[in-house]
Amino acid sequence: MKKYLSMLTTIALSAASIFSTSSILNSYAKNSNLINVDNLHDVIPIDIVEYPIFADNGETTVKTFEKNVIVLFSDPSKLKYIELTDIKSHVDFHINGKDYYNDQSKNSVIVSSDTKFIDNSISHEGNMNKVQQTVSYDYDWNQKAFIFKFVSVETVTANNEKDTQFVRGYFTTSLKLNLHEF
């Protein structure tokens, strides 16, 4: 009887762990795009195209866009470092009939647990528009998965009451896992 109860307890705890972990992964997937990656030797392209946001009458508008990437990875001790490559950022805006834009690019950046990798902005006649991109990651030991969270925050400010404008930004990058060679 004790052996039977012990087996039931083990099964119940295992099931609880799976459901708990699933809810963690599901919380990352909500309101975001999700990419599942099986081959760790692939370079993972990441594109975030954001919708334009508008501001007028002296107001400021802020909008956040997110994309999550989950990478299954069985042995984190083999990981040498995490790198973003081919980073490109673009921000443009339209104000009073004219278009303005700014592009930035970086070859690569090493990812720490919370990395700010692009801070792209453009201003004209007191109107400030910016796009700020960050990436953070977490490791889920139960599912043996890295969860990368890319966040892009757009801010558009129309300082003049007669101004109406929109700002739009996007960025592309590639996620690369560099492994120890054995």
Where in the sequence are the language-model features?
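Classical Sec-dependent N-terminal signal peptides that target proteins to the secretory pathway
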Residues: 1-29
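Low-complexity, repetitive regions of proteins mediating host interaction that are extracellular
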Residues: 3-4, 25-182
